[in-house]
Each structure stands twice: as C-alpha cells, then as structure tokens.
C-alpha cells in the first residue's frame, strides 16, 4: 500500500507545511533564478521547466525518496529485462524494444526479440517503398493515392496523432486517412472522397475480432466490390496488422500482406510497431526511423539518468504529488502547437487506460486516488474555452504547456504571438492578480474587484522543443509513456492491462442481438430495457 510507506507519510506532513505558501513568494526571493535552473531539465531534445510547481528542493527530495521506497526504478529495470510485469495477463512489457537496434539485447521470457522486431520493421519499410514508388498498385494497375487505416483505440489514436503532428513532413505520393468509429458516418464520409481503384485499406486489429474495426473493414470490403473490384482482386487493396493469421486469411487478405506484432506490446504503446504502418506510409521510412531515434534517446535517458536528472521520473512524481496530496482530480495538457492538437486524445488513453485502476497489483483495494482525468485542447483555443476554470475555479488543475521554439509554418508575426500567449498563461497561473493590483489597474468599482482577482499559485510545467520534427515527437511520446509508468509504479497498480474496457463490450453483444430482432437472452435493468424498446421502434 503506497500510503503506508514512510515517504508518503512524510510527504503528507510536508504538503501541509507548504500548502499556504504562495509560489510568488518563492519567485520574489533572491534565489529565484537558481530555482529555475534547479528545476529545469534537458533530455533527448526536450527542455522542461517545472519551476512553476508547488514544490521546494525538499519536496523533490521527498518525492524521489517515495519513488525509491515504492520500487519505481526496480520495476523499471524489471520491465527492461523483459520480466512479466503485466502480472494480470502474465506478459512482458517491451514497447521499448520496438525502438531498439540490432545491438540491443531485449528479451521476453529469455528469448531475444530484436530479430523479429527488425524483420517487421524492414517489412514495413519495404512495403512503404513499394507503395510510394508505384510498384504496389490497385487492381486496375493504378498506383495507390490514398490509405485508410481502420482501427480503434491504440490502433488509431497514436498513429492518427503522429500523422497529424508530422503532416508537414508527409510524402507527396499518398494521403492517409483514419476510420475508427462504428458509426457508419465515419467510414462513409471518408470514402465519399476516395477512388476505390487507388485506395488501400490497413485493417489494424491485434485479434482481428475488434467489433468496430471489423464492422468497418467488412463495410469497406463491400465498398470495393460494389465499385467493381473483383473478390479475387481485393488482395491489391487490403493489408492487415494483426496477430491472428487465421482470421486475416479468412477475411481474404494474403498472409504475405500481414504485419504482425506481439503480446508484449500493449495497444496504447504500439505506434512504434506494425501498428504504425500508416505512419510509415504517411511520412516515409526515414522519418519513422528518426521518430524511433528520438524515442530511443528518451529510453536511454530514463534507464540511465540519476533520479534528480531523470525527466520522466520527476514528471511522473509531480503527477503523484498533485493527485495524492493536493486532491487534483484532473490534469490539463495544452500544446501551443496546432499540429499537436490530437496529443491530448492520445494522452487520455495512455494515462487513463493505464492508471484508471482502483486495485493494486495484488488485487487489494488501493486507499488513495489514482489516475487523474486528462483533458485539454490546443492553445490558444483553450484560452477561450476552459481557461477560466483553471485560473479562477475552485480546484487545482496542473497544466502542461507544450510548444516549439521554431514554427512549423512560418507566417510573419504568428509564432511570437503564440509563444507570448503560452508563456503568459504560465505566468498568470503562477502570480495571479491581487485586489491591490486590480485597483492599481484602474478599477474603481469595489463590487467588481473580487471578480477580477486571480488567486494564482496554480501549478504548470512548460515543455519546449526546438522544432516539431520526428525525433522530438518520438522523445515527447516516450517521455509520456515513461511518466505514466512511474505513476502506476508508485500506486502499485498494473498500468498495462485494461479490464475496464471489457465489460461494456461484453454487454453490447446481447443488446445488439435484441436490436436486430432476437429475443432477449439476458436480463437488463429497467432503464436499458426502455432504451432498447425505443431504439427497436426506430430501427
């Protein structure tokens, strides 16, 4: 139980001792510049300023002591050795191997994994080169111009986010689209703009049984046939990313066009694997390799850096600090970089599916709050939507600001405005505005003064990249993966299963049968019965 650890008890007292301290006092002190230097880290091309957090040097020491007592780095080392740290599914957790090179000796159950990782990576590279060169064609002999990735969850969110983020690096030969929702509108609106003769589908499902993915795959299959593609020619328009060879063949996809991955790859950690085939097609093998390089640099940092210099460790411990000692129920991610607009969607799955747990690894209930709700949008949009709550709401919401020093697209004057707003929001959250400052600003209506006061003392962290390139994005994502791991390790939960996803899927099957006319096979609550009855009348 993490709350029983001596360091947790000490941090509980420490949090009370500094709770009333305003961060503006720390920044008004003569050693403010030293504080910034001490609480700024650089790793794998990222610069992170975490000085605007409600911590002192003693706080950091105690948080790192908690990490030690919780065995965070011991569990990290076990993960890197390929031990089965996913204890509920009896699996290793080796997404770091997906970034590895031939000289790395990653193993699962004692067996080297790099030969297979490199084989699939080469298969992805060769396939992308064939598509880009026009060597791979559709049934009519025309080159492929559009690729549709059909997947959901980890088979969609990561690749979709990366392709959006690196769109400025996209190859000119193909356009990549994503379909995930079982709502037919998602697929139909995508296909409305495509030519079946020049379209390729990637069916991305580990089991090749995922309801949403297979419904969309079968509908896209019908679309091809309805537009004149013979059944025997569908092999020119479908490839699969899966571990289920039998189901892939049964669907009609040539097994030579199947890209595999392994049970030690969790869905939300899988964009580096064959699940990232859409990424390779979108930006090309060279940029994909650069993304792996950036992630590998962060992996090396996480594995070797001393605790006080270990970026993912410290960021993870800050999350534990606010969730466990300041009752922060949510955390906000705000990328001041429009191409990163889908990063928060990715982070939601990464953190909430990993750490949205209420039992420990041994099955016992945990007696502290775990995974915060992750939310946010791209800045500056968020300033005109929800920043009111972050600045003047009744609860603390730690914010991560993420931006680039160089613009992705350089329109005169735009980037300075973007950076100014990013930095100003962090400063405003830090300092706030007192009643005296409001009055000094010319407000004479005393009834208005309380409404214009900002408490400040709201924590934020700023993550800077020199530019948004494949390597820096790889490092950013790997850092997020590792900080998520750190949180789960402290809470003593298994961050690598997702049993909470299963129950709803199981209950949907008999309801679907009833909606399609079958008699009820299971009992439902009265509300669900009424909803089914109403839906059946409309279908």
From Swiss-Prot:
It is an enzyme of class 5 (isomerase). The keyword Protein transport does not apply. This is Glucose-6-phosphate isomerase. GO terms for biological process: gluconeogenesis; glucose 6-phosphate metabolic process; glycolytic process. Catalyzes the reversible isomerization of glucose-6-phosphate to fructose-6-phosphate. It is found in: Cytoplasm. Pathway: Carbohydrate biosynthesis; gluconeogenesis; Carbohydrate degradation; glycolysis; D-glyceraldehyde 3-phosphate and glycerone phosphate from D-glucose: step 2/4. It catalyses: alpha-D-glucose 6-phosphate = beta-D-fructose 6-phosphate. GO terms for cellular component: cytosol. The gene is pgi. PANTHER family: GLUCOSE-6-PHOSPHATE ISOMERASE. Keywords: Cytoplasm, Gluconeogenesis, Glycolysis, Isomerase. InterPro entries: G6P_Isomerase, G6P_Isomerase_C, Phosphoglucose_isomerase_CS, SIS_dom_sf, SIS_PGI_1, SIS_PGI_2. Its main location: cytoplasm. It comes from the Bacteria. GO terms for molecular function: carbohydrate derivative binding; glucose-6-phosphate isomerase activity; monosaccharide binding. Belongs to the GPI family. The active site is at 353 (proton donor), 384, 505. The keyword Protein biosynthesis does not apply. Its EC number is 5.3.1.9.
